Swiss-Prot record:
Belongs to the polyribonucleotide nucleotidyltransferase family. It catalyses: RNA(n+1) + phosphate = RNA(n) + a ribonucleoside 5'-diphosphate. It is found in: Cytoplasm. The keyword RNA-binding applies. Mg(2+) binds at D490, D496. It comes from the Bacteria. It comes from Staphylococcus aureus (strain bovine RF122 / ET3-1). This is Polyribonucleotide nucleotidyltransferase. Residues 557-616 form the KH domain.
Amino acid sequence: MSQEKKVFKTEWAGRSLTIETGQLAKQANGAVLVRYGDTVVLSTATASKEPRDGDFFPLTVNYEEKMYAAGKIPGGFKKREGRPGDDATLTARLIDRPIRPLFPKGYKHDVQIMNMVLSADPDCSPQMAAMIGSSMALSVSDIPFQGPIAGVNVGYIDGKYIINPTVEEKEVSRLDLEVAGHKDAVNMVEAGASEITEQEMLEAIFFGHEEIQRLVDFQQQIVDHIQPVKQEFIPAERDEALVERIKSLTEEKGLKETVLTFDKQQRDENLDNLKEEIVNEFIDEEDPENELLIKEVYAILNELVKEEVRRLIADEKIRPDGRKPDEIRQLDSEVGILPRTHGSGLFTRGQTQALSVLTLGALGDYQLIDGLGPEEEKRFMHHYNFPNFSVGETGPVRAPGRREIGHGALGERALKYIIPDTADFPYTIRIVSEVLESNGSSSQASICGSTLALMDAGVPIKAPVAGIAMGLVTREDSYTILTDIQGMEDALGDMDFKVAGTKEGITAIQMDIKIDGLTREIIEEALEQARRGRLEIMNHMLQTIDQPRTELSAYAPKVVTMTIKPDKIRDVIGPGGKKINEIIDETGVKLDIEQDGTIFIGAVDQAMINRAREIIEEITREAEVGQTYQATVKRIEKYGAFVGLFPGKDALLHISQISKNRIEKVEDVLKIGDTIEVKITEIDKQGRVNASHRALEE
């Protein structure tokens, strides 16, 4: 990498974009500093000197949010950054996906991309800056990379598309789209949307691609200026004679019939047996452990299986389980299968099954998100778990990984637009989707199961959501789009394009591909085929439950809303929170108070809610002119007595208002602790209350 500092500038969505090379992190294979507005990201690319064994490309993308970038000190005892949060993990995945397909086939060196956010401007996305930084770090390095790529964020407001919308614009946008690609095609899409049409989504994707092309041209100018010398990489050549011999054996032993097996586990077992039979043909009795030969035979066999699966789909239009390209697997769904939970839905599609379980909580049960932006209170959460047994495997049980975090977030994005507002449904909602069986499209099964759970719980959702995953097999001059892909089609195909939405439109999409990019024609056709599949699944789900239940579970907390004057909030809270804690301790409820005076009281028992409400009403109660009260004498003065009307409110009973008869001394008729009926005659501008007993005698 060049050791001389160089600075390159352009404009991006009305803000300055600067890329600097040659000054920082000079021992990395490639490093750039990206300045976008006041956002600053350091992106580095490093590769190992030797390749790794295995049949996968060991690429790792990291995205680190440094709290100092937003002028914050991390929370917790250690006061330093820990493991990446969910948002950072999702950003790392977002960057990985458009970059991964652009490395040479067969390249097995470890490659690590590091993105450090050094300064964060909320209106200048650090995520998009990191994507450009990752592309540039690879492009100016000696690592072989067929980029550059770029990514942009697209919003949709009042019928107009916007590149990299500000925080305020995102609040009113119907679309939150991240799209990435190179100059010729789109190769990554991620979006959440408020029921936009397929055509609107298509236009948004290619509106974003126009800006991507400009950014790629800018990066290419930098590469042409720096002229990095790339590592020489020569892919290993296949022994064609060996390939032909193995191919002949696979045909002889019935590879086609083995692939065309309905049951996933039976197919896997049959393929393993076929491979073992063929490998045994090559084992030399004098050298039975020739590992290099055995590895090569297995590698060729795996490639031949892939070629056969793709040939069957592309030429014969038949899939491994016998389906047609646009056919959906058998569907089954149930609700209310767990008696003590607040809502549950079981969704099964072929050999993929998800159990989604919903829990309702008080508003105070929200998740607090403390990242580089302002603190955020999240009242809807969707979590996804993928245990080993779901694919018939064993292994250690670990905390959720990148895949589980990503699938959970996709489901959350698909469903959040149908969740009712706090005013209509004052609850925190958490859904956990447990994948019990998996043969592809488990994330979309979790979305369908979650919709069932929401309706079973009685959540008044705006509309049901269903999800489906689309696949693709390309040939030189043709392509085949697949509806509802299974595991083998995902692994051996060219695309995993997930689409979720209501009957009216799309609420989320996510596209991953293994080829260079997709044309407008393919994306348009995939979206339309997904729409038809989504509606078919939706119709099945609505046969199980067609609308949310009218009542919540008996085990769900009840939430009652009441309103007080904003200036009374301090009375309910009390000094240092003393009063509100007393209410919570006495009644066992959860209290959430908004700045406008709205109070949410939550508890399982209605009696607890009623008692808490009574206490709050007593605290915030106000005297009214003309009302009568049974008052208690609290203090006596020469000019009258101060009486308590109710907790927190006293009134002056002047000596002239005690009786219609003349009184010389207050003590002649009243003493502290006496009860006397009074009528409120006046409340002055300072809120002081005057009362009269005499008015009741006349």
